[in-house]
C-alpha cells in the first residue's frame, strides 16, 4: 500500500482511499474553528500541495501550501507559534508546479465521507461509532478478511444499529467504541457462517 504523494502507514493509506480520514478532519475542523458543517467544504486535490484554505467574507482566500510532508504539520503543532527549519525539508518550488487540480468529491462514490458528515451533524455518540467501526473494518481489510468496499458498508451498519447517546460521558464513549468494534466483528462472523 502506497499513497501517491504522502509517506504514511497502511492504516492511514486506507483511510485516505476511503476518505474516512477526510471525514474525521471535517469533524476536527468543526470543533477547532467553531464553524458549522455546512461551512466546511472538502475538495479532491490530487497534487496534495494546498493543505487548507479559508474564504473570508469579502471572498478572498488564504491557503496553506507546501510539499506533502506530515512532518511539517507535526513540527508546527509542537513549536507553535514559532516556525522552525524543517530538517531535510524540501521547499515548494512554485515555478515547477504547473497546474493545481481541485474537484468536488462524489459523495456516492466516497460514501465514507457522507457517513462522516452524518455522524458529525448528528453528534452525540455517533462519531465514536463511526471511528470505532472504521478502525476495526480497516484492520480487517488489511488482514485480508474483508473486501475494500465492505469497510464503509460495515461502518454504516454499525451506525444504523447504534442507539444514540446525546451527551455521552468518557466512560460511555469507551464502551461505545468497543461496542462498534465488536459489532463489526460480529457482522463478519455472521456473514462467514451464512456462506
Predicted regions and their residues:
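Catalytic, metal-anchored helix/loop core of enzyme active sites in primary metabolism
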Residues: 1-195
Amino acid at each position: 500500500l502506497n499513497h501517491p504523494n504522502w509517506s504514511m502507514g497502511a492504516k492511514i493509506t486506507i483511510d485516505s482511499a476511503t476518505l474516512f480520514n477526510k471525514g474525521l478532519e471535517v469533524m476536527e475542523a468543526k470543533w477547532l474553528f467553531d464553524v458549522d458543517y455546512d461551512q466546511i467544504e472538502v475538495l479532491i486535490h490530487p497534487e496534495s500541495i494546498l493543505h487548507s484554505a479559508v474564504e473570508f467574507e469579502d471572498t478572498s482566500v488564504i491557503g496553506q501550501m507546501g510539499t506533502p510532508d506530515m512532518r511539517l504539520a507535526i513540527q508546527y503543532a509542537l513549536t507553535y507559534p514559532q516556525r522552525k527549519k524543517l530538517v531535510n525539508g524540501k521547499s515548494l518550488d512554485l515555478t515547477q508546479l504547473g497546474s493545481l487540480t481541485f474537484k468536488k468529491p462524489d459523495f456516492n462514490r466516497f460514501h465514507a465521507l457522507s457517513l462522516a458528515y452524518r455522524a458529525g451533524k448528528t453528534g452525540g455518540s455517533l462519531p465514536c461509532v463511526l471511528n470505532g467501526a472504521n478502525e476495526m473494518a480497516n484492520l480487517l481489510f488489511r488482514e485480508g478478511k474483508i473486501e475494500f468496499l465492505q469497510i464503509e458498508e460495515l461502518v454504516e451498519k454499525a451506525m444504523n444499529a447504534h442507539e444514540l447517546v446525546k451527551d455521552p460521558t468518557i466512560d460511555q464513549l469507551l464502551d461505545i467504541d468497543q461496542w462498534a468494534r465488536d459489532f463489526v466483528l460480529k457482522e463478519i462472523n455472521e456473514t462467514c457462517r451464512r456462506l
